[in-house]
Amino acid sequence: LLSNHRLIRSMDALLKKSTFSKALFLSSSMASTPKSFWGAYAISKAALNHMVKIWANENKNNNLSIMIVNPGKTSTKMRAKAMPGENEKVLQTPEEVAKKIVNLIFLNKVSKGEIFDILQI
């Protein structure tokens, strides 16, 4: 969380100088769905979402587009460790998620702290 805060503060002025810049942050549905044994992860994602939304509100009068993306269930090492035995064939691959994120980035839409669910894109 602190690294994201420092990144925002370091890049804020530069992003504002650009004609049309975008900032994208990866979150998780865990930010709003409390689950047992996921406390630190869920808290960090909830705090990230809140911090990014505050930053978006601070930039509501310029062209800086600020997005939060929930990639959804993705076949990663973290997920395999957390969910052993889960059928990976029903999960998105990281490459599929990345392609959707790239498409989202290139939409001609200014976002002000919206949360985009990759599974719905």
What are these regions (language model features)?
Residues 60-66:
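Short, charged low-complexity linear motifs
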Residues 68-69, 76, 84-121:
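C-terminal helical subdomain
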Residues 4, 20, 46, 78, ...:
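Structured catalytic cores of enzymes that bind and process phosphorylated ligands/cofactors
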Residues 6, 12-60, 73:
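Catalytic loop of short-chain dehydrogenase/reductase
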Residues 24, 66-69, 79:
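Hydrophobic structural elements of the Rossmann-like NAD(P)H-binding subdomain
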Residues 5-9, 96-99:
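Short, contiguous clusters of charged residues that form electrostatic/catalytic patches at enzyme active sites
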